[in-house]
Amino acid sequence: MGTQEQRFFDLFEGHTGAHGQTSILNTQRRGKQEADYIIIREPLTVELVREHLDGKRGVGTIPIDETNMCSYGAIDIDDYDLDLAALYSKVTRLKLPLITCRSKSGGAHLYLFMSEKIAASEMRDKLAEFAAALGWGTCEIFPKQEVLLADRGDVGSFINLPYFGEYPTRYALTENNGSLSLDAFLDKAEDAKISLKDLAAISIGGDGTVLPQGPPCLQQITELGIPEGGRNNTLLNVGIYYKMVDPESWRELLEKHNQEYCIPSLPAKEIVKIQEQLDRKDYYYTCKQEPLHSHCNKVLCKTRKYGIGNGETAPTLSGLTVVESEPPVWFLDVNGMRLELSTKQLQMQVEFQRACMEQI
């Protein structure tokens, strides 16, 4: 067994040509500890990891490597009033292969460690599924990119690592909301490594047995049990789905869904109101409303026959990074495709659209 720093280095292996460094400031903004972040275009070393563990210099790694593969990923929940104990319990209850760590400002990083490298796109897809099942479908996923334009200087985005210094704020959680020691974390993370085959076999709701080819959010909410407080809006959207699937029998299907999956069932008069509402006009899914929003998996939903594929045309933008050259060069993910942009193309809609047409 190697040293702490070597094991930590191996666990968070990522891009070999760059890493991140963080300087913590003595200020907070909207509940988040402020810091200066910078990408260093040099390899991370075991010596730098030791400095991180000793609290001398905070480092982060870029999960995606130069070949668009990764050996770990993370769900980044930036909610600083987060109930970490409840989150830990939900991860455990759903039997997800995630290590729950507190972030520096009180949010959470949920790490997934692989026994083999997998495509960054596969990592992002699976973590998005897990995040949606946990009710955090709109949070950030690392790696932020599926593909890097490595030959153009694109290195991706880094995530801060846990166990900085005496780790008063960044540590892995225990069942009773305590903290794991560094050695215990390393043991747990190494034991939690999973193969691609075993990862692909995990399905947390939304596996198609309920509401086939429907939005994964509705599938997950249904399979977990539709609770009070979310019944009306969930059933409205279930009704929208059934109207598309079976225009003749959707009313009966909606009533059956209510009886089988709502806890407790919605009163009959409320179901009638929903049916009358859907009779008056054709609605589309209310994706921005709860509880759908928290269980959103937009990328997967777009592939479903009765998902949002025909109702939403706005592109999904993520993973913006910059090479601070003269002039600056920007990189952005558009529906999973990596674009290289000038500042003008990034600022002006017509120029941005032209770049999309030329590069995608």
Predicted regions span which residues?
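Short, ordered beta-strand-loop transition motifs
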Residues: 30, 65-67, 104, 151-153, ...
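Conserved short hydrophobic interaction patches
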Residues: 90, 94, 126-134, 257-260, ...
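Short polybasic amphipathic segments
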Residues: 18-27, 169-174, 329-334
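A short linear hydrophobic-aromatic micro-motif
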Residues: 59-61, 95-101
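Modules that initiate DNA replication and primer synthesis
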Residues: 107, 114-120, 167, 190-358
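Short, conserved phosphate-binding/catalytic loop or strand-edge motifs used
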Residues: 100-109
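DNA replication initiation on ssDNA origins
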Residues: 1-72, 82-87, 163-166
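DNA replication initiation modules
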Residues: 61-82, 88, 115-233
